């Protein structure tokens, strides 16, 4: 019933898009008769029209799309099909276009990118990795340039490349920019750490199309981008706590909730810890760090798996993205968790760095005036797209009917019998010369199947995170005659597997999946490796009762039935009742997994709200300071009065010594005036005296700065230094606080409410500390000039 209603709604949306499509098609013949010069001149015509008439882009959409369509035919030899036009219209309107593998999403995106770039405000195509961004940029660059638009790759594809001054500015200030979500996110954070308007390089974020949008803003939504700063004081407890954790018994001394990714000590475990570390109670205030370390060690040991969440490369822990199977080099878990895993694996413990800046992909893309996306599996995430981003998903029909045969699951009592059946199936397919792609959940399983196939004289390509450099080549070869490719769920997403004619004739690509993934969208993505653009092929998932999905997310005890474990595998597989029961267990487990993941993303989004609001306010204030041409209207005396009024109230400045010490610390290193004539019982008299000292010291520094530009730079840098030092500390504190409240077992206490309450309190404290730092910087900084005559500021 629900499926039928959804289809009706989708058809209504498509009807609206087809009305616009008909307008574009009506222009096809006219535009095909244009000379190259006339067609190229359209870009300038559109820009002039938009500027002169202040018109919306919708007014010129049919003509703009007809222009790109005809230009694509002439420049690329590709003429966008009607279904691609539908997807392009949907994306310009800010929707998610669900387009199946091989339907030409790269070409589809050129139309809304071109249209939105006509405003002069820029348009981005954002994808998941460098290879895809560079590939799409190189393929589409001739089209944009022929039409008179500038296009760039938003990064230099050289490892450890150091950008020259203004180089990033040049890369980003093009009409159209191709980049990745990770690179754009880090550049956004870096741009907002600039202390000079000339060091900023990002333009205002106008319009973006996100490729594989569900992977980026749903699956990766909980992964924050983090820029690290100075190292924290390193604890020496990691190895000691690791040894203690090894003495604990699961379910007796601690409880693990794998689904919620939580772990905590029981009363017995707490007593054991107190006894082990020879303290009265580990929950005394002075042992807070010890409790934190115990929880970190437990999380490292029980919630993170080698070869699934991380692996060891060159003696270092390298994280793996569970969803894509890709390595995340240079990325570290925060708040000491990375170091706990290093201790667990006996590798050298790295420095735990403080957090300078952070943002999630959810909030990164909310910085755009508008964004849309495309994916092959959007419908399954439609509710979340709407709840989090107010985006609807429009299912775009395929140009050719999907010929792939998605066969029913094959079910087994245990993993050993299932693995034997998978190997027999792959060998059987290989004997027919039909190419096969075997996809596994983990790198460990992929390595096992690859090795077993080699033992049976079946040559194969192994594609896992550790050899991702060969990904594109392996995937390109996966559709060749007799090819066998074993891969994790990364499986070359975004890269088409093209079939030779011989392979097409013998049934296309066979996709064998060794277990259901936690998310039905990922299952669909993996099946979609076969059957592109009406190609033949088939997919099949093999299931056992001890699959990770079933063990983690199902409470069924069917796997413990000894009769099932001893039954002949073929008889069991042919049992309709058994298959029905297992299908029900798997479907329910996957549903629970998806619901839990959605709740976790909602929770992450709730946690992010506080820091998001604070970050937006801080970044807006920084930009206001950077863009200021003078500070003539800024009331510095009122700033000083606010600070001194609070300090006189909260600090004991009622003695001459206390007042002089305060002046040394905040206003002047060389103060030598007599304060004996000040009435120490009169707060206003003390405040007036401090304001007088502030004004004198501030003016002294302005005199050193000499000209108006240097005075401006001194004030800007002093204020920014105050904001940044306190904001960096606030961000780090909020990261630590989030980790702390996640570890607490607070009964009915709402941890989100608690987090927001503390976050607001600390923000208010931070705001006062920023003012105090501003006063100190304006009074205590030392201004000097280097041999080139450039001003150098030494802050207190």
Curated annotation (Swiss-Prot):
Stored NCBIfam families: PRK09200.1 (NF006630), secA2 (TIGR03714)
InterPro entries: Helicase_ATP-bd, Helicase_C-like, P-loop_NTPase, SecA, SecA2, SecA_DEAD, SecA_motor_DEAD, SecA_preprotein_X-link_dom
EC number: 7.4.2.8
Protein role: Part of the Sec protein translocase complex. Interacts with the SecYEG preprotein conducting channel. Has a central role in coupling the hydrolysis of ATP to the transfer of proteins into and across the cell membrane, serving as an ATP-driven molecular motor driving the stepwise translocation of polypeptide chains across the membrane.
Recorded catalytic activity of this chain's protein: ATP + H2O + cellular proteinSide 1 = ADP + phosphate + cellular proteinSide 2
GO biological process: intracellular protein transmembrane transport; protein import; protein targeting; protein transport by the Sec complex
Transport is among the record's keywords: yes
Binding site for ATP: 84, 102-106, 496
Source superkingdom: Bacteria
Quaternary context: Monomer and homodimer. Part of the essential Sec protein translocation apparatus which comprises SecA, SecYEG and auxiliary proteins SecDF. Other proteins may also be involved.
Record's bilayer topology term: Peripheral membrane protein
UniProt protein name: Protein translocase subunit SecA 2
Entry similarity comment: Belongs to the SecA family.
Pfam families linked to this entry: P-loop_SecA, SecA_DEAD, SecA_PP_bind, SecA_SW
Keywords: ATP-binding, Cell membrane, Cytoplasm, Membrane, Nucleotide-binding, Protein transport, Translocase, Translocation, Transport
Annotated GO CC locations: cell envelope Sec protein transport complex; cytosol; plasma membrane
Originating organism: Staphylococcus epidermidis (strain ATCC 12228 / FDA PCI 1200)
Cystine pairings recorded for this chain: none
Subcellular localization(s) per the UniProt record: Cell membrane; Cytoplasm
An annotated Gene Ontology molecular function: ATP binding
């Amino acid at each position: 019933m629900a499926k039928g209603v959804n289809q009706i709604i989708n058809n209504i949306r498509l009807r609206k898009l087809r009305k616009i499509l008909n307008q574009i098609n009506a222009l096809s013949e006219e535009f095909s008769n244009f000379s190259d010069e006339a067609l190229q001149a359209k870009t300038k015509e559109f820009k002039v029209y938009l500027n002169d008439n202040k018109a919306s882009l919708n007014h010129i959409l049919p003509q703009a799309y007809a222009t790109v369509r005809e230009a694509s035919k002439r420049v690329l030899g590709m003429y966008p099909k009607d279904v691609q036009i539908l997807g392009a219209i949907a994306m310009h309107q800010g929707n998610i276009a669900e387009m199946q593998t091989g339907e030409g999403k790269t070409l589809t995106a050129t139309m809304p990118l071109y249209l939105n770039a006509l405003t002069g405000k820029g348009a981005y195509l954002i994808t998941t990795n460098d290879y895809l961004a560079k590939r799409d940029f190189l393929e589409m660059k001739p089209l944009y340039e022929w039409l008179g638009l500038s296009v760039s790759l938003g990064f230099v594809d050289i490892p450890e490349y150091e950008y020259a001054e203004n180089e990033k500015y040049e890369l980003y200030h093009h009409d159209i920019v191709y980049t990745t979500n990770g690179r754009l996110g880090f550049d956004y954070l870096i741009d907002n750490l600039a202390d000079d308007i000339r060091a900023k390089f990002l333009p205002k974020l106008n319009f973006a199309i996100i490729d594989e949008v569900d992977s980026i803003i749903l699956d990766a939504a909980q992964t924050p981008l983090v820029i690290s700063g100075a190292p924290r004081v390193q604890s020496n407890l990691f190895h000691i706590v690791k040894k203690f954790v090894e003495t604990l018994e699961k379910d007796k001394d601690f409880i693990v909730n794998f689904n919620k990714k939580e772990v905590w000590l029981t009363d017995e475990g707490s007593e054991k810890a107190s006894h082990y570390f020879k303290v009265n109670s580990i929950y005394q205030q002075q042992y807070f760090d010890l409790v934190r370390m115990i929880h970190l060690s437990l999380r490292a040991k029980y919630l993170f798996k080698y070869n699934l969440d991380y692996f060891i490369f060159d003696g270092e822990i390298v994280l793996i993205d569970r969803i894509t199977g890709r390595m995340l080099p240079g990325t570290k878990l925060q708040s000491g968790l990375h170091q706990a895993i290093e201790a667990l694996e006996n590798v050298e413990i790295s420095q735990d760095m403080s957090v300078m800046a952070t943002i999630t992909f959810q909030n990164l893309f909310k910085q755009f005036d508008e964004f849309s996306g495309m994916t092959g599996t959007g419908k399954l995430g439609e509710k979340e797209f709407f709840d989090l981003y107010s985006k609807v998903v429009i299912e775009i029909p395929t140009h050719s009917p999907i010929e792939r045969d998605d066969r029913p699951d094959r079910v087994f009592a245990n993993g050993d019998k299932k693995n034997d059946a998978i190997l027999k199936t792959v060998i059987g397919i290989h004997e027919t010369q039909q190419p096969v792609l075997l996809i596994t959940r983990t790198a460990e399983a992929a390595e096992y199947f690859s090795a077993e196939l080699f033992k049976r004289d079946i040559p194969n390509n192994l594609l896992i995170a550790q050899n991702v450099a060969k990904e594109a080549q392996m995937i390109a070869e996966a559709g060749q005659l007799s090819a066998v490719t074993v891969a994790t769920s990364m499986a070359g997403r975004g890269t088409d597997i093209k079939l030779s004619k011989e392979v097409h004739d013998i049934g296309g690509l066979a996709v064998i999946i060794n277990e259901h993934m936690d998310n039905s969208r990922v299952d669909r993505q993996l099946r979609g490796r076969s059957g592109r653009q009406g190609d033949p092929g088939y997919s099949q998932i093999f299931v056992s009762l001890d699959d990770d999905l079933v063990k983690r997310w199902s409470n069924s005890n069917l796997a413990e039935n000894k009769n099932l474990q001893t039954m002949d595998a073929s008889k069991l597989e042919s049992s309709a009742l058994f298959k029905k029961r297992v299908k029900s267990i798997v479907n329910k487990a996957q549903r629970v997994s998806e619901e839990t993941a959605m709740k976790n993303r909602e929770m992450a989004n709730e946690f992010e709200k506080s820091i998001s609001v604070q970050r937006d306010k801080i970044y807006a204030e920084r930009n206001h300071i950077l863009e200021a041409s003078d500070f003539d209207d800024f009331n510095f005396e009122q700033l000083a009065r606010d600070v001194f009024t609070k300090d006189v109230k909260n600090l004991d400045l009622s003695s001459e010594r206390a007042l002089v010490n305060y002046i040394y610390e905040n206003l002047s290193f060389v103060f030598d005036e007599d304060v004996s004539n000040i009435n120490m019982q009169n707060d206003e008299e003390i405040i007036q005296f401090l304001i007088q000292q502030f004004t004198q010291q501030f003016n002294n520094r302005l005199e050193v700065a000499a000209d108006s530009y240097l005075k401006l730079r001194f004030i800007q840098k002093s204020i920014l230094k105050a904001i940044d030092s306190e904001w960096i500390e606030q961000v780090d504190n909020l990261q630590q606080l989030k980790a702390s409240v996640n570890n607490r077992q607070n009964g009915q206490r709402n941890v989100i409410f608690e987090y927001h309450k503390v976050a607001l309190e600390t923000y208010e404290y931070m705001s006062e500390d920023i003012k105090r730092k501003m006063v100190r910087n304006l009074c205590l900084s030392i201004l000097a000039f280097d041999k080139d005559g450039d001003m150098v500021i030494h802050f207190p």
